[in-house]
């Protein structure tokens, strides 16, 4: 009989289950309290109950755990310094959506060489998240793959659905199940309505199929996530200006949704020129000083060293520098965070 299935499968490998990985790297009571408390604080900011600003900042992607931990340690100092004005959360992105092809992140390819040791990547991701949370720094990530979230979601305080997947039904269903607040980016063309539709969908109950923590295929029914919000990330042109934010809030109001959102300083808003994140910051700070309460949070891409680098076989990587989108360096990071804190002073 002719084969009709698995005709294009080149490799099959057993995968550790989420439950097995959690036994190796268990959540401690202290970390569980930290994650729970961080989520509650973020929810209050998104609901307008807390006047502070949510600041989600960090490398475009994680590729080096040592550099990531150094960044987290420095970020914790900024958290302590500005905790009365800012809720600082570290970007810990392990999955990268690609327009065509490219490195897909630490979980898929931790060795950066196409060997795709996914089991090792999942282990590294969970290990790092535990260490960062143990420092007292909340973590944020993009939920891209429908399965890998099962391995790390218990350690995440804030999640994102990216511009390429906000319109996806299965990602909206996944967001409805997540235990953390979830931001939906506007589309790559700048369309914010798809993000509003995603928020509405994620607030509803859904049923979908997914493996559970033990790897058993399961029918999940969700209760819905009430903490969805827009991430203004720009598109063909920036959309961080006051009129753009007002227009997005008008759409939220139309559907009786909270009129609070997050502005991404990078991506379409900086037109892929990383230093322009500082210009976006200046504009947002002025909007806050002018009395804007709609801006609940911001996102920015920064690392220890400015810029980006290519992966070249046989050549060492520059420590603390991004291998995906270019990032601000640490000195600019400190200035950016300081400016945000001073702007938020006017809310008190």
Swiss-Prot record:
Its EC number is 2.5.1.54. Stereospecific condensation of phosphoenolpyruvate (PEP) and D-erythrose-4-phosphate (E4P) giving rise to 3-deoxy-D-arabino-heptulosonate-7-phosphate (DAHP). It comes from the Bacteria. SUPFAM superfamilies: Aldolase (SSF51569). It comes from Shigella flexneri. Keywords: Amino-acid biosynthesis, Aromatic amino acid biosynthesis, Transferase. It is an enzyme of class 2 (transferase). It catalyses: D-erythrose 4-phosphate + phosphoenolpyruvate + H2O = 7-phospho-2-dehydro-3-deoxy-D-arabino-heptonate + phosphate. Belongs to the class-I DAHP synthase family. GO terms for cellular component: cytoplasm. One of its GO terms (biological process) is aromatic amino acid family biosynthetic process. This is Phospho-2-dehydro-3-deoxyheptonate aldolase, Trp-sensitive. Pathway: Metabolic intermediate biosynthesis; chorismate biosynthesis; chorismate from D-erythrose 4-phosphate and phosphoenolpyruvate: step 1/7. GO terms for molecular function: 3-deoxy-7-phosphoheptulonate synthase activity.
